[in-house]
Structure formats: C-alpha cells, structure tokens
Amino acid sequence: MITAETKDGFAVELSEEALDNVELLDALAAVQDSDVLSLGRTIRLLMGKEQTRKLYDHLRTKDGRVPVVALSNALGELMESFRAGKNSSSSPA
C-alpha cells in the first residue's frame, strides 16, 4: 500500500496496482493537456468513488462548491506524494 497526502492534510491509501491502469494514464494525459473535463474521471480512477467523495468533501467551500483549481492542485500533490511513497517503500532499508 502507498499512502499519499496533500499539503492541507487529506490522506489516501492505495495499492500499487491502482496506479497500474492504462485508463488512468489516458485520463492523466488528458488532464496534462488541459482537459479539465477529465479531472473528475481521473480522480475516480485513481481513488475510487468513496475516496473521491471524501476528497470532494475535504475541498468543499462554505457555499458547497468544489473548486476546479483546488481539485487540480490536490491531484498534483497526491501524484507527487504517491511517487515519493513508492520510491521510499522500494528503497533498501
């Protein structure tokens, strides 16, 4: 399992197999190409429906919105944290 955390404290734990998904790779590529409509799908593919709902609730503003920029930033931070966690877990002890 790999644990990732955003800078504001949202944490999620995933198996390494969750990252081995070509559909996730396609969705990440679309987000990288500035296709913001792929952002929600990317998060769901990465974390599943329940964890996605928790992230949305974590990012939700007082007026009930989940800002696109906040979600995009969270995705970047989670991917960065997953990479760091994967690298540290595979390093020799």
Role assignments for model-derived ranges:
Residues 1-5:
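Short acidic, Pro/Gly- and aromatic-enriched capping/linker segments at domain boundaries
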Residues 10, 15-93:
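Short, surface-exposed, charged amphipathic helix/loop patches that serve as local interaction elements
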